[in-house]
Amino acid sequence: MGMTITEKILAAHAGKASVEPGELIQAKLDLVLANDVTAPVSIKELEKASLDAVFDKERVVLVQDHFVPAKDIKSAEQSKIVRDFARKHDITHHYDVGDMGIEHCLLPEKGLVVPGDAVIGADSHTCTYGALGAFATGVGSTDLAAGIALGEAWFKVPEAIKFEYEGKLPEDVTGKDLILHTIGDIGVDGALYQSMEFTGSAIDDLSMDGRMTMCNMAIEAGGKNGIIAPDKKTIAYVEERATRPYKVYTSDPDAKYARVIKYDVEKLEPVVAFPHLPENTRPVSEAGHVEIDQVVIGSCTNGRIEDLRMAAKILQGKKVHKNVRCIIFPGTQAIYKQAIKEGLIDIFIDAGAAVSTPTCGPCLGGHMGILAKGERALATTNRNFVGRMGHPESEVYLCGPNVAAASAIAGRIVHPREVE
């Protein structure tokens, strides 16, 4: 019996010829990631254990992104813990104010994750890197601490679900719409502890930015990881950035899947997820009259240059509705600079939007766009749980950047074509 791409990567990192679903393995790691929220917990435990050195100062990545620049004393103290640890252990890849970015936008951009890697991160959206053909998954601070010290982690090999997306994507349908449609179909626990393998002609047509959006939200269906086999687009992207050698894996023709789910993408339209779960999806044409108070465009899901270009194309020459606050935050400093170079930031500001430094802030209800009681936000982020972006009696709706930009103009949730 053949193996899936995820099984092959895990087998290689466990030093085994093969693995099968349900098997417990100890795997060597290529990269261990943490941020200003999750790292301090691990650091305190490592200091209690008198850690002399991290397993590899080149393979531990610390990204200050959740509360950066620090919003209050507590967040400043957390950042200092990370900063001091990075200096003490001479961590090569520590990203702080000025050179930071949202971690899951930053690492691919820096070439720190490559095809065939095994990566853990103390952030649930670490699964983003599956778009590069890597096994990447989120862990808690205990497993993170072990990873920092030893460069290893244990896993139960997940079953796999194969998702086949066939047909040509309609003009207004994005990778965000594909993954929201999928989560709406299978539910937020539809892929619980399973590998979500995205395939098909529609995936082939997606840009790398679109693929990262899809893999980013695998966790929202309960997935252990999301993954897309590398192709020419992947290799072209990686070759420009890779900081080390890599190995490409693909699934065998006779690999075993728990399920195979097929979608005809030509029938799809832009999707909106209603409160309070990403599975509560509707085509935007069926959204009804939903007025909004705030629009957020950015995050590790949709803060890449393609997303900003899409939003700018719609906002150009128009104005954000008088009752809407529109906040746009590029995923990294490099993306921010590229957006300036292309004139996108001018378009956003002229339209009446606020542009933020790269941060996770509003996505987790941390800062830079908190919702008050009774307010509604439409966001290109990845979660819309109760109280996710502020008051527990606020509401969050999820969508792609084109729907977000159009709705910012209209003051209510609309199809992008309604504001052309």
Curated annotation (Swiss-Prot):
It is an enzyme of class 4 (lyase). It catalyses: (2R,3S)-3-isopropylmalate = (2S)-2-isopropylmalate. Heterodimer of LeuC and LeuD. Pathway: Amino-acid biosynthesis; L-leucine biosynthesis; L-leucine from 3-methyl-2-oxobutanoate: step 2/4. This is 3-isopropylmalate dehydratase large subunit. Its EC number is 4.2.1.33. Catalyzes the isomerization between 2-isopropylmalate and 3-isopropylmalate, via the formation of 2-isopropylmaleate. [4Fe-4S] cluster binds at C300, C360, C363. One of its GO terms (molecular function) is 3-isopropylmalate dehydratase activity. Belongs to the aconitase/IPM isomerase family. LeuC type 2 subfamily. NCBIfam families: hacA_fam (TIGR01343), IPMI_arch (TIGR02086), LEU2 (TIGR02083), PRK00402.1 (NF001614). HAMAP family: LeuC_type2.
